Structure formats: structure tokens, C-alpha cells
């Protein structure tokens, strides 16, 4: 279905004189490096058909280039980050709106993570940076048994806590409605810049989520069995291994994801109600004071 939508839109845009690059995106397909390397002029817009996972993949690759994304929910489940397919029913009208600048651009903060060896005197990273729009997850990795992770967390160089459990989530406000809310973290409005730390199934009841200002640097040290690695995940995609003696530093990225919003009546709170199926109280009361 996504391919059918893409082919239809590509034909229409080419008829309007646009140059269109088209390719599949999924767990085994990553067209973005080829797209970015094959163009001689800046890309004006990326149109992505799929679910939130498809939009997240596009964001990680396109945010460094400043390319805005029009994400359309085709076959997805939640659709927190996407426009509804109903908004694209009259595609010709959509192209005219884009040409006439009749849309909004929503900017979402991102996180970046890097691996370092040893203490803070070593400022040279061992890895490239890994971008995340939703969250960075630090979790134990073992192919044959479920192990408890022991993670020490620093904030701005100060040790805050040691967590024993299934791992640690470091998320953006955008990601607060994903893995983070499932792990008991707070929902943060995406108009804010903040970093949310949420333990995953901690063994201590006193280990609670923390909301940090955007300038904070979160460092996580694995303290488990030296023969076992810990894994770094970004938006559910495996990034790299973290071994004892190494740390991962997570901070706000200089890049931001730009989403095209077509809905003129867009409401974040309406999205929360619909996607999270908030039903309110069992008894419904009438507010006669509202005009």
C-alpha cells in the first residue's frame, strides 16, 4: 500500500516538474544514503509513507541535512508522528498547498549519543554519534539468558544513581509517548525541550523517572559482568555495544527534525486522547460553565 501511494505521488510531482527519488524504507532497506549522495541540489522535501517507525528512520537520516518530512500514516498502528491518509486523499490539493506555503513546520528536538573509553579526562569519542528522535536505550545484551543490568548514571559529571533492572531510557518529549510511557515515564509536550530519564523495571522502588533541562549531559556506565556487553539502541534500532570501562554520553543534538503539518485543526491533546484511548471517568459530567 505504501508503494502504491509513493508511485502515485511520484507521477503527479514529476508532472509538476519536480525531480523525484523513490525507494523502499524498512528494517532491511535504507535508501537515504543513496538519495543524499546522488543529488547535486538540496532536497526540498521528503514524503514518507508508513508508520511512526518509518518516520523515525527518516528523521535520523534527514535531520542533519535540514530536510523537512511529510510523514503519512499508511498501515501504521499509532501514528503519533504522521499525518492521516485522509489528509492525502486529494493529493493535487496537497501539492498546491505545499507550493503556496500553506502548511506548518513542527520542529522536534533530538538526542545524540557517543561512546567514550575511561573517565572524563578522555574526551575523544570511540564512536560516531548516534541520533535519536524518540529515545536512547541502554540495555543488557545476552543471546542465551535474561540478565539484570547494573548501570551507573551521571548528570553533568555528578553521580546520581545506580540502577539495577532491565535498562535505562533517555528520551525526548517526542519519545515520551513511546517506550518511555510504557515504562512508567511522564508524558512531556513536544513543544518543550527536555530530557527524560526512565528506568526500565528497576529492582528498587525508589528509582523514579527524572526530567532534566535540555542542556544536561547524561553519562551511563555499565557495571555488569566484564565478559558481557551492554547494547545502545536508538529509536529501537541497535547502535553499538558498550563494554565495562566504557560510557555513553547522551545530550541534546544540534539537529532538529522538521515535520510538515497539513491539518489546520491539529491538536496535540486530541492526538493523545485518540492514540492512547483516553476515555475519561466512567461517569460523564456536564460543565455548564464553559461557553
Predicted regions: what they are:
Residues 1-49, 61, 85-104, 115-130:
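ATP/NTP phosphate-donor binding region
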Residues 3, 53-59, 177-182:
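Short glycine/serine/threonine-rich phosphate/pyrophosphate-binding segments
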Residues 47, 73, 136, 236:
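A residue-level signal for conserved active-site and pocket-lining positions in enzyme catalytic cores
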Residues 49-52, 173-174:
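Glycine-rich beta-strand-to-loop/alpha-helix junction loops that act as flexible
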Residues 66-70:
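Proline-centered loop/turn at the N-terminus of a beta-strand
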Residues 75-166:
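Catalytic core of DAGKc-family lipid kinases
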Residues 118, 125, 138, 155-159, ...:
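ATP/nucleoside-binding phosphotransfer catalytic cores, i.e., glycine-rich phosphate-binding loops
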Residues 159-206:
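Gly/Ser/Thr-rich active-site loops/lids in small-molecule metabolic enzymes
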Amino acid at each position: 500500500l505504501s508503494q502504491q501511494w509513493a508511485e502515485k505521488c511520484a507521477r503527479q510531482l514529476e508532472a509538476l516538474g519536480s525531480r523525484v527519488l523513490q525507494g523502499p524504507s524498512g528494517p532491511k532497506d535504507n535508501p537515504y544514503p543513496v538519495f543524499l549522495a546522488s543529488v547535486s541540489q538540496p532536497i526540498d522535501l521528503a514524503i514518507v509513507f508508513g508508520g511512526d517507525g518509518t518516520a523515525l528512520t527518516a528523521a535520523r537520516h534527514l535531520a542533519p541535512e535540514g530536510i523537512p518530512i511529510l510523514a503519512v500514516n499508511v498501515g501504521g498502528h499509532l501514528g503519533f508522528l504522521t499525518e492521516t491518509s485522509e489528509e492525502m486523499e486529494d493529493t493535487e490539493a496537497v501539492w498546491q498547498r505545499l507550493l503556496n506555503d500553506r502548511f506548518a513546520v513542527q520542529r522536534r528536538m533530538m538526542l545524540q549519543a557517543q561512546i567514550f573509553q575511561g573517565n572524563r579526562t578522555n574526551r575523544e569519542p570511540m564512536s560516531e554519534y548516534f541520533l535519536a528522535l524518540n529515545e536512547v536505550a541502554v540495555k543488557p545484551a545476552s543471546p542465551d539468558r535474561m540478565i539484570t543490568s547494573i548501570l551507573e548514571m551521571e548528570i553533568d559529571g555528578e553521580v546520581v544513581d545506580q540502577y539495577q533492572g532491565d535498562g535505562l531510557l533517555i528520551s525526548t518529549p517526542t519519545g515520551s509517548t513511546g517506550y518511555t510511557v510504557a515504562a512508567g515515564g511522564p508524558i512531556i509536550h513536544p513543544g518543550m525541550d527536555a530530557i527524560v530519564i526512565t528506568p526500565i523495571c528497576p529492582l528498587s522502588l525508589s528509582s523514579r523517572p527524572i526530567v532534566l533541562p535540555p542542556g544536561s549531559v547524561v553519562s551511563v556506565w555499565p557495571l555488569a559482568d566484564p565478559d558481557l556487553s551492554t547494547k545502545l539502541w536508538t529509536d529501537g534500532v541497535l547502535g553499538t555495544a558498550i563494554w565495562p570501562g566504557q560510557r555513553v554520553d547522551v545530550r541534546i543534538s544540534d539537529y532538529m527534525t522538521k515535520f510538515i503539518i497539513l491539518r489546520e485543526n491539529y491538536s496535540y491533546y486530541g492526538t493523545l486522547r485518540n492514540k492512547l484511548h483516553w476515555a475519561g471517568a466512567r461517569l460523564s459530567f456536564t460543565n455548564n460553565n464553559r461557553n
